């Protein structure tokens, strides 16, 4: 057994404007090459666009999008007797949030358009309304888990 101390899980501080932990996670996920001010600018512009388009609080729209995009189950590769099985496992809360943030950013970036803020805002709005590529990815993940339900007894 290891004798090393287990480090505590560190969480980023809440952001300055919305005082939200989720927004700071989004900012740190958009971050490239350490340019945090640019990442903050993109997120806050996207939230302004959401406010103009939906006439709702952008934080509630964003939280709804995260809830809609969070997967319940996923598949993990498990090697048993020389063959690899895709074993369905439940997703923990933090991982589900992380996956949904990752998918929203990825599919927002893949949208056609100029500004990342506009693309991100549109993806968040679509995800909050249960449409878009992020929701397709979640459903695809659930279908994979459903198809491999027979291997559920190979749990970790």
From Swiss-Prot:
Question: SUPFAM superfamilies recorded for this chain?
Answer: Ribosomal protein S7
According to its UniProt entry, this protein's organism is: Phaeodactylum tricornutum (strain CCAP 1055/1)
Q: What does this protein do?
A: One of the primary rRNA binding proteins, it binds directly to 16S rRNA where it nucleates assembly of the head domain of the 30S subunit.
Which UniProt keywords are present, listed alphabetically?
Chloroplast, Plastid, Ribonucleoprotein, Ribosomal protein, RNA-binding, rRNA-binding
Cell compartment(s), UniProt: Plastid, Chloroplast
Assembly information from the UniProt record: Part of the 30S ribosomal subunit.
Could you state one GO biological process linked to this protein?
A: translation
Q: What is this protein called?
A: Small ribosomal subunit protein uS7c
**In the record, what lineage is assigned to the organism producing the protein?**
Eukaryota, Sar, Stramenopiles, Ochrophyta, Bacillariophyta
| Molecular function terms from GO | rRNA binding; structural constituent of ribosome
Q: Name one Pfam family in it.
A: Ribosomal_S7
């Amino acid at each position: 057994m290891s004798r090393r101390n287990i480090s505590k899980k560190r969480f980023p501080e809440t952001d300055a404007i919305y005082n939200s932990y989720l927004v700071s996670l989004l900012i740190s996920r958009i971050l490239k090459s350490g340019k945090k001010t640019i990442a903050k600018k993109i997120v806050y512009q996207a939230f302004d666009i959401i406010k103009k388009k939906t006439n709702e609080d952008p934080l509630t729209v964003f939280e709804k999008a995260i809830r809609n995009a969070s997967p319940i189950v996923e598949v993990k590769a498990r090697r048993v007797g020389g063959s690899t099985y895709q074993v369905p496992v439940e997703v923990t809360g933090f991982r589900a949030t992380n996956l949904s943030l990752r998918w929203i950013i990825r599919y927002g970036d893949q949208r056609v358009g100029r500004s990342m803020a506009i693309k991100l805002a549109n993806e968040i709005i679509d995800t909050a309304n249960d449409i878009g590529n992020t929701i397709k990815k979640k459903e695809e993940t659930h279908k994979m888990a459903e198809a491999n339900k027979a291997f559920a007894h190979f749990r970790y």
